[in-house]
Amino acid sequence: MVKLGFVIAEFNRDLTFMMEKLAEEHAAFLGADVSCKVMVPGSFDMPLAIKTLLQKDDIDAVVTIGCVIEGDTEHDEIVVQNAARKIADLSLEFGKPVALGIAGPGMTRMQAEDRIDYGKNAVEAAVKMVKRLKEIQ
């Protein structure tokens, strides 16, 4: 059984809550176990929590769940670009999958509501990567 850790952003919680629930349901459907959940203020705050989970022996992969909505400045782009870069770096550093389930940047609230399946898709990617990496090790 694949053991997942979830790192969930509290910012735009109404949306990340729906993303989280879909992700949990899909994990159960795939036979994966969500062993640990960590809530962080926002997507930019995820890397430290991800690193902590990746250090645990009982976590095979981490799924990120966040939603960054466009504002009047380029803040959303900076947040997502930096978070995504660090997330990829951590995956490579620890040799474990970290799936990007962050919706955004450059999206309106309405678009965000249409993209709540990003968490589900991240679970799918994480589980597939764990299984495929085990095949080649």
UniProtKB/Swiss-Prot annotation:
What pathway or pathways are given for this protein in its record? Cofactor biosynthesis; riboflavin biosynthesis; riboflavin from 2-hydroxy-3-oxobutyl phosphate and 5-amino-6-(D-ribitylamino)uracil: step 1/2
Q: Where is the active site?
A: 75 (proton donor)
- Name the reaction it catalyses: (2S)-2-hydroxy-3-oxobutyl phosphate + 5-amino-6-(D-ribitylamino)uracil = 6,7-dimethyl-8-(1-D-ribityl)lumazine + phosphate + 2 H2O + H(+)
One matching Pfam family is: DMRL_synthase
Q: Which residues bind 5-amino-6-(D-ribitylamino)uracil?
A: 11, 43-45, 67-69, 100
Q: Which residues bind (2S)-2-hydroxy-3-oxobutyl phosphate?
A: 72-73, 115
- Asked if the keyword Transmembrane belongs to this entry, the reply reads no
Assembly, per entry: Forms an icosahedral capsid composed of 60 subunits, arranged as a dodecamer of pentamers.
State the protein's purpose.
Catalyzes the formation of 6,7-dimethyl-8-ribityllumazine by condensation of 5-amino-6-(D-ribitylamino)uracil with 3,4-dihydroxy-2-butanone 4-phosphate. This is the penultimate step in the biosynthesis of riboflavin.
Annotated protein name in UniProt = 6,7-dimethyl-8-ribityllumazine synthase
